Each structure stands twice: as C-alpha cells, then as structure tokens.
Amino acid sequence: MKHIVKHIHFVGIGGAGMSGIAEVLVNLGYEVSGSDLSRNAVTDRLAALGARIAIGHDAANIEGANAVVVSTAVRSDNPEVLAARHQRVPIVQRAVMLAELMRLKQGIAIAGTHGKTTTTSLVASVLAAGGLDPTFVIGGRLISAGANARLGTGDFIVAEADESDASFLNLYPVIEVITNIDADHMDTYGHDFARLKQAFIEFTQRLPFYGSAVVCVDDPNVRQIIPFISKPVVRYGLSADAQVRAENIDARDGRMHFTVIREGRSPLAVVLNLPGLHNVQNALAAIAIATDLGVSDDAIQLALAEFNGVGRRFQRYGEVPSADGGQYTLIDDYGHHPVEMAATIAAARGAFPGRRLVLAFQPHRYTRTRDCFDDFVNVLSTVDALVLTEVYAAGEAAIATANGDALSRALRTVGKVDPVFVATVDDVPDALAKVARNGDVVITMGAGSIGGVPAKIVQNTQQKG
C-alpha cells in the first residue's frame, strides 16, 4: 500500500475506532490527517505524534490525501466525503483500513456483542508480557499503555472486530475470538437474529486453514453456531466442556481468584486484577490464545495480576467526599446494553459486598432504548438509587416512547427504584451530590457524553478543597 498511498485522511479521527488505526499508520510512517467536531485528548495525542488535525469538517481538509477513511457513523453528505467523491479520492471504510493493517501481520480479531474492548486489552497485555510485542488497536484506552493503539515489533496485531455494522466481515485474521452473541445493532441485520448469528458464522469462514476460532461456550448463542464452524475451535468458559476452563472462582477485594484447567496442562492459579465473572471469561480467552502461542504460565499470571484495566471499563476514580461528611467510591463504565450493565452491577456487588449501589445512567440511542426497553427497566431496577438522564441520541431522531422520561415512568411503575431524572449530563454531578452517601459505590454508566462526568466530579471536589 505504501508505494501508492502516502497521505491518509480520517473523517472523525477522534473516535475510538478511528484514532487507533490512525496512530498505527502514523507510526508506520504515513502522512496522516484528520478532522473531528471537537478537540479532545485523543486528537491532542495524534497531533503530538505528527498527525495534522482539523476541528470541523471542511472540503479543504482532504487536500493532498490519497485515501479518505470513514466509519459508518459518517454521513454521506459530509463535506469531506463529498469532496473526496468529486476528486475521485478513494473512500475507505474503517474496517477495510484495519484489514490492510492485518495484512502486514498475523491478525487476532476479537468479536462479540459485549466484552470486545476488555478482551482485546487482556490479549494484548498477556502477549506483551510473553515477549511477543504485539501491535494492538483497541476501542478504549489501555491504561498501562496510555493509548488505545500501539505499533509493536512482533508478528501479531490484536484488534476489535465490529459486528455493529457487519464490517468485521472485511477482516481475515488467523485467530478469532467470539465472546458472545446478543441482540444489539439489529437495524444492521433487519431485526433478524438468525441473520446476526449467520454473520458470526461467516466471520469464522474468513479464517485460513491453519487458523482457529476461540469461542465462549457459556453463551448459548455462541454454542449454537459451533457446529457450523468449519475451522478448528477452542472452547473456553466456565462450562464443563470448555477446553480452557475456570474453577474455584473467588471474588476478593475487587479481584477474581480462580484456577485455570487446560487440556494436557497443569492447573494454573490466576489472580485477575478485575472484578466480575464476565471478566474471568474475558481472561480465559486471553489465556487460551497465549497458551496456543507459547506464552509461559509465569507471564500469563503476571500480566493478569498487574492488569490496570481499560478506560471507561469499571474505571475507578477513587474516593470522593459525600455531602454527609463521609466519602463514596466513584467508578465509571461504558456499559450501554442491559446485558453489559447487569454484568457490571454484579461485578460491583461482588467487589463491594454490602454497600449501597448508586447508578447514574445515560441511555445510548433511542432505537436501542426502544428495542431493549423492558430489559433496561429490569436491570435499572436492581440498583439501590438511580440518576437517569435523557437518551444520548448519537445522531438518531427522538422516539417519545423510548426517551428518558418514558423510562423513568416505567421504573416508577415497577416500584423497585425511584429514579432522579435530569435533562442533561451537566446536571448529573449535582444530582449525585444529593443522592450519594457515605460508603456508597457510585457508578456513572453509558456510551455517550456521561463519560466526562467523573472527571468533572473530581475537579469540583478539588476546587472545593
């Protein structure tokens, strides 16, 4: 590619999926430019690495580009897309550019409705501890690396494979992980769950004859597609028929202690520096891959025990003063689907037994809120106190029967929790200040703008102090 394409432009370069690819390309020596609607820490980092960043979208931004990279979130009437089309500059989907990177190395692609980012981070961390120095492209910031991407010198590239727009079918990795299959982004699949499962089967058909599919057999939908996978399969999970299995699981002090059982290997005692059974499953995927690639047990144990997590995945902000003179524990999480939320709430209950759990939740997308409405009501009813915001639209038109007010009314009808409804995330810090008490565990959750709330709370605390 490099002898033809010198300058690559990204429309929406600050996004989680785009920025990692851009960073790897910068480090490979390409001229990289990009635009986004606002400046953030990601765009600042890319600029410091040498990328040319423009705030706002304008036709002039693509000047000199040999290719323009877009995601499915970029509208066809974007001025940079229109300019590229007019100038006959190739417009490349994000997943296609990721596929080009995978051609340079041996790809390890992590797919699944939930857990992709954490699992990708765990795989990258364990392989790095084993001396394989992988390249990685992650949908969140790997805290130990301070970035969501890195160009390694090793043979492997570890990346998320996105099923939300079916773009993972552009990838041709040598190892695939499927964490789970759940009903999300169903507009892509015509609201046909069978089509979604078929897409995952087709994903495994991208593997070479020497490749392998590493799949979580605890998920019933994953288990259903195994007979249709024609390539070698490695089963992981808590189930009795898993080839890489966790036993003797014990949650202590926010960590998961367990024993790994692998066919033909001695049992391996592991301490995972993350809470929750779902993270035990994510770690098992990393252990399965690392074992297959010859990473030592010592390196596996060290990487998991010292894993510092991923930004916005049960990210701890420490202790914050409460209005009653005590303090509460503040945590932030990206969860935005009821299944993810339930897993995070269960992890919090396990990590902080007996403590009151307060959730500040911003629903993400009206269509998801509509499609999963009853499930949202059920999972939100399991917390002890709730601050609820209006739905983060993500470009969608509002749906009156699936907005924050409708969700609040439904929760009050069920009667297990009385939500405090606020119109915007700017109101969340004040609302939490009134709700949170000494000893509480407070979680801010959602895939939208609520991610900026914890830092704002900490900043407010420092200013008062």
UniProtKB/Swiss-Prot annotation:
UniProt-annotated location(s) = Cytoplasm
Record's keyword annotation contains Oxidoreductase: no
One GO cellular component, as annotated: cytoplasm
> Which pathway does this polypeptide act in?
Cell wall biogenesis; peptidoglycan biosynthesis
Q: Does the keyword Ligase apply?
A: yes
What Pfam families does this protein map onto?
Mur_ligase, Mur_ligase_C, Mur_ligase_M
Q: What enzyme category does the UniProt record give? A: ligase
Alphabetically, which GO biological process terms does the record hold? cell division; cell wall organization; peptidoglycan biosynthetic process; regulation of cell shape
Q: Catalysed reaction(s)?
A: UDP-N-acetyl-alpha-D-muramate + L-alanine + ATP = UDP-N-acetyl-alpha-D-muramoyl-L-alanine + ADP + phosphate + H(+)
Q: What does this protein do?
A: Cell wall formation.
Q: Which family does it belong to?
A: Belongs to the MurCDEF family.
Protein name from the UniProt record:
UDP-N-acetylmuramate--L-alanine ligase
Organism encoding this protein:
Burkholderia vietnamiensis (strain G4 / LMG 22486) (Burkholderia cepacia (strain R1808))
> Which lineage?
Bacteria, Pseudomonadati, Pseudomonadota, Betaproteobacteria, Burkholderiales
